């Protein structure tokens, strides 16, 4: 159900600086940093903090530009994703590559020349045959996923020395893959596509990475995905002007509802995701992004935006 009186949102800041379209934003999980990326090929990092507003006793959030990273990508930077530690930033680009950036510790920077950047590129991942649309770190930092216009999803294993190795290439979609998102507590990956579907993948002990479920309910391109913080729900936003909320069901719940999972993996047999609620009638244009608020909300609709 939808709240009777939706909360009013107040604009905190208007961040300007990119010369062209801004495509994606990502909050650093450990530091007070916000990353943005753009068609201008740059990545901008903003710090933020709360300041007392004086006599009223309230506070305001102030943003400040910390660094502009010339990404080195040859085309649009489409997506940014932080590692769980907040020390590595991944970028995906229409030039078909993924860039990897790491923070230079203060003790090392002190020995470098003035003006040296706080972040430097330490690697580039290649493999996609066309535009790389999205990139996402797993909750524990063990894996990085990327997807592209070539209909593929790549999974990269992250080794302790920050060396990235391809762990799987999955071509389950029939069209352009728009986004990839990891489950917040398990190594489950979701992807969404121009083919109107959502795919779920797991590292099966017998078959490596496999697609174990296909979610179908949207009537057009699925642009965005977001797992709830508790991991029980998945929200999907689409070109069909609606948002679906999917509920994760175990094998017993699937049997009770008469749901038969489309695919099976040896360690997820019988599990399924059920389309439990559809938000529609509130949008007049395609929905390009959806995200959950922090916290384990008992009612999924109350924490979604």
Question: Across the structure, where does each feature detected by a protein language model lie?
Answer:
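WD40-repeat beta-propellers
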Residues: 43-48, 98-103, 135, 153-158, ...
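A short helix->beta-strand "capping" segment at the edge of beta-propeller domains
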Residues: 3-18, 60-67, 117-122, 272-276
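Conserved strand-to-loop turn within each blade of WD40 beta-propeller repeats
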Residues: 37-40, 91-95, 146-150, 191-195, ...
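Short loop/turn segments immediately following beta-strands, especially the blade-tip
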Residues: 47-57, 102-114, 157-162, 202-207, ...
């Amino acid at each position: 159900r939808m709240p009777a009186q939706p909360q009013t949102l107040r604009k905190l800041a208007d961040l300007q600086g990119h010369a062209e379209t801004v495509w994606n934003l990502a909050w650093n999980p450990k530091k007070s940093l916000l990353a943005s990326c753009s068609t201008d090929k740059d990545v901008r990092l903003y710090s933020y903090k709360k300041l007392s507003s004086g006599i009223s006793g309230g506070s305001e959030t102030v943003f400040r530009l910390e660094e502009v990273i010339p990404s080195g990508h040859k085309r649009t930077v489409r997506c940014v994703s932080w590692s769980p530690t907040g020390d590595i930033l991944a970028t995906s680009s229409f030039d078909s590559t993924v860039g990897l950036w790491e923070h230079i510790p203060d003790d090392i920077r002190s020995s470098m020349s003035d003006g040296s950047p706080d972040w430097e590129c330490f690697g580039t991942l290649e493999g996609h045959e066309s535009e790389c649309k999205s990139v996402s770190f797993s909750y524990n930092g063990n894996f990085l996923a990327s997807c592209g216009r070539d209909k593929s999803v790549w999974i990269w294993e992250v080794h302790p020395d920050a060396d990235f190795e391809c762990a799987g290439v999955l071509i389950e979609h029939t069209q352009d893959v728009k986004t990839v998102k990891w489950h917040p507590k398990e190594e489950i990956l979701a992807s969404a596509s121009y083919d109107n579907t959502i795919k779920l993948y797991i590292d099966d002990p017998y078959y490596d990475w496999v697609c174990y479920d296909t979610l179908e309910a949207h009537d057009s391109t699925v642009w965005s995905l977001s797992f709830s913080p508790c991991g029980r729900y998945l929200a999907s936003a689409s070109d069909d002007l609606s948002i679906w909320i999917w509920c994760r069901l175990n094998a017993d719940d699937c049997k009770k509802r008469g749901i038969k999972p489309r695919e099976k993996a040896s360690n997820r047999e019988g599990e399924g995701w059920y389309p439990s609620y559809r938000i529609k009638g509130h949008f007049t244009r395609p929905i390009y992004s959806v995200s959950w608020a922090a916290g384990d909300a008992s009612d999924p609709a109350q924490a979604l935006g």
